[in-house]
Swiss-Prot record:
This is 1-deoxy-D-xylulose-5-phosphate synthase. One of its GO terms (biological process) is thiamine biosynthetic process. It comes from Alcanivorax borkumensis (strain ATCC 700651 / DSM 11573 / NCIMB 13689 / SK2). Thiamine diphosphate binds at residues 87, 128-130, 160-161, 188, 295, 384. Belongs to the transketolase family. DXPS subfamily. Its cofactor is Mg(2+); thiamine diphosphate. Catalyzes the acyloin condensation reaction between C atoms 2 and 3 of pyruvate and glyceraldehyde 3-phosphate to yield 1-deoxy-D-xylulose-5-phosphate (DXP). PANTHER family: 1-D-DEOXYXYLULOSE 5-PHOSPHATE SYNTHASE-RELATED, 1-DEOXY-D-XYLULOSE-5-PHOSPHATE SYNTHASE, CHLOROPLASTIC. Binds 1 Mg(2+) ion per subunit. Binds 1 thiamine pyrophosphate per subunit. Keywords: Isoprene biosynthesis, Magnesium, Metal-binding, Thiamine biosynthesis, Thiamine pyrophosphate, Transferase.
């Protein structure tokens, strides 16, 4: 049995056997009985390393045994392991030469929190979004076949990710190609099936045994010349499986289903994988695991321990704490909390409101709504396409759907947004969470493309609140609009604005001027408003909180263009196609000739690190905004002087 820990070690644990493993090749030299010790040392080191820097926690703890068994049986990196989503990849990184760097994970300049091809040859496919592993692994299996190689490909996918359509699309194709692909279903909350009792466990062991597999494969070859006999045997086998397992779905698709087996018994995993490794055709191994395995608090609260912050050691000397913390130290609500509170308040007023989320209840702030309004709450699992079209169908029946979705995940439902919502002018409100840079989760989770892909869609309106109160009011404004609307807001807390409980519909397409200045006008969008205001003071610049990206406040922009010599747009979005591009288009349409400076994210993927650090590196903090404006003003002055000469 693996060890269970109750505390996260604050000092590096003693891991003598793990320390000898520089690569999976070293792991494969060990006798099988030593793997249990490797498992315990790896899990303890994982607890320590994540405690040092913070990061995804429960998923990695749950696949320690599986990770060890896979690298022990498969000749990685020649054999390909594809981890779905990637939250569970930390043990994999520890075993593949990155053990001592793990304390830098998700930090600027450190390891990525997800598998990343440029980081290691063992990271065979970059991930972050869910349900892509089977497609990628199948592509690798087909590529190996075309090259005449016997390399193996394995996709490791969780039960949540298995609910997405792409996973089944890939499995259907794999069954058609009959490629040598192993899919491991890592089932850590029994959402796929719930097999109970000794009969189920008994048959699961039989189906995973070497003798049964050999008998099955040999019989298939012999009986292939006698179709009637083989059909009878196959139907008998299926009937036996169906008595004790509801997972006939995978057999019906065309996979040989094995399991379920205990994902925390490393010896059973090794034995089963050894039996499966050389089989021909698509195989599915179903393993049961516990998220947070080996750390008692995480096993008791897997949702709360999905990820953790850095563990700070307690100071030896007690520091006096003020009886009344300053306003700066008071805990500010996150934008997700503001959305969740607005959703509940709005639902109390309007019985037509329906909340929809694709498996992001906690992250999107919908827990309270799900408890208070269970009949009007739909978690559709990792099915973004379905979420959007479901909302469209509800709108057809005079309901008022609100879809809470991360900006980066709405990309998956783009066709549905155009075809099933916007084209039909259906009344659907989208709460776009994690808009802009997200920080430690990196490029896979950045919401930096939404303005570009949304503002091209007819009938769509887009709001970008600058603070907590504006977020609440713009959500209300979007909800009151009879048509598709999106409100984008960042991860985490805002500047600390007082939130008015009264909800007021703000005029669509109307900005507000926050500061009057000379020469320079800054058109700030969303979360960039506070930094723009700070930069404007030494510049004596005008600052306009634009509020809306579509429609733009044309009058305010043209007025600012007429009264200033430099127009500056600031946004936490890719420059191409973003809000600045929209302003440029408007000025071009109106034949306005003016110097315009577009400050936005550069044309490359921005990787992981603290959000404020990444914004500063992109020149989107107050100092960077001021510096770039001064550089442009100096350039204007040089051009004027050159013209005068």
């Amino acid at each position: 049995m693996p060890k269970t820990f109750t505390q996260i070690p604050l000092t590096r644990p003693n891991t003598p056997l793990l320390d000898t493993l520089a690569s999976p090749a070293d792991l494969r030299k060990l006798p099988t009985p030593q793997l249990e010790r490797v498992v315990d040392e790896l899990r303890e080191y994982l607890l320590y390393a994540v405690g040092q820097c913070g990061g995804h926690f429960g998923a990695g703890l749950g696949v320690v045994e599986l990770t060890v068994a896979l690298h022990y049986l498969y000749h990685t990196p020649d054999d390909k392991l594809v981890w779905d989503v990637g939250h569970q990849c930390y043990p994999h990184k520890i075993l593949t030469g990155r053990r001592e760097s793990l304390t830098s994970i998700r930090q600027a300049g450190g390891l990525s929190g997800f598998p990343k091809r440029s980081e290691s040859e063992y990271d065979t496919f970059g991930v972050g979004h869910s349900s892509t592993s089977i497609s990628a692994a199948l592509g690798m299996a087909l590529g190996a076949e075309m090259a005449g190689s016997d390399r193996r490909a394995v996709a490791i996918i969780g039960d949540g990710a298995m609910t997405a359509g792409q996973a089944f699309e890939a499995m259907s194709h794999a069954a058609h190609t009959r490629s040598n692909l192993l899919v491991i279903l890592n089932d850590n909350n029994m959402s796929i099936s719930h097999n109970v009792g000794g009969l189920s466990n008994y048959f699961a062991r039989i189906w995973a045994s070497k003798s049964y597999i050999a008998l099955r494969e040999g019989g298939k070859k012999v009986l292939s010349t006698m179709p009637a006999a083989w059909d009878f045997i196959r139907r008998t086998e299926e009937s036996m499986k169906n008595m004790v397992s509801p997972d006939m779905l995978f057999e019906a698709i065309g996979f040989n289903y094995i399991g379920p087996i205990d994902g925390h018994n490393v010896n059973e995993l090794v034995s089963t994988l050894r039996n499966l490794r050389d089989l021909e055709g698509p195989q599915l191994l179903h393993v049961y695991t516990t998220k947070g395995k080996g750390f008692a608090p995480a096993e008791a609260d897997p949702v709360g321990y999905h990820a953790i912050n850095k563990i700070e050691p307690k100071p030896k000397v007690q520091v006096a704490v003020p009886s009344k913390p300053s306003a700066a130290k008071q805990k500010l609500p996150k934008y997700q909390d503001i959305f969740g509170q607005w959703l509940c308040d709005m639902a109390e007023q309007d019985p037509r409101l329906v909340g929809i989320t694709p498996a992001m209840c906690e992250g999107s702030g919908m827990v309270e709504f799900s408890r208070r309004f269970p009949g009007r709450y739909h978690d559709v699992a990792i099915c973004e396409q379905h979420a959007v079209t479901l909302a469209g169908g509800l709108a057809c029946e005079n309901q008022k759907p609100v879809v809470a979705i991360y900006s980066t995940f709405l990309q998956r439902g783009y066709d549905q947004l155009i075809h099933d919502v916007a084209l039909q002018e259906l009344d659907v409100t989208f709460g776009l969470d994690r808009a802009g840079l997200v920080g430690e989760d990196g490029a896979t989770h950045g919401g930096v493309f939404d303005l570009a892909y949304l503002r091209t869609v007819p009938n769509m309106i887009i709001a970008a609140p600058s603070d907590e109160n504006e977020c609440r009011q713009l959500l209300y404004s979007a909800y009151q609009h009879e048509g598709p609307a999106a409100v984008r807001y960042p991860r985490g807390t805002g500047p600390g604005a007082t939130i008015e409980q009264t909800m007021t519909a703000l005029p669509i397409g109307q900005s507000r001027t926050l500061r009057e200045g000379l020469q320079v006008a800054i058109l700030a969008f969303g979360a960039m408003v506070p930094a723009a205001l700070e930069a404007a003071i030494p510049l004596n610049a005008t600052v306009i909180d634009m509020r809306w990206v579509k429609p733009l406040d044309r009058d305010a922009i043209l007025r600012a263009a007429a009264q200033h010599t430099l127009l500056v747009t600031v946004e936490d979005h890719q420059q191409m196609g973003g809000a600045g591009s929209a302003v440029n288009e408007l000025l071009h349409e109106e034949a306005v000739v003016l110097d315009v400076l577009n400050l936005a994210l550069p044309d490359h993927f921005i990787h992981h690190g603290k959000r404020d650090v990444l914004l500063a590196q992109a020149g989107l903090d107050a100092a960077g905004i001021e510096r770039q404006i001064r550089e442009r003003l100096n350039r204007q002055q040089r051009l004027r002087e050159a013209h005068q000469r």
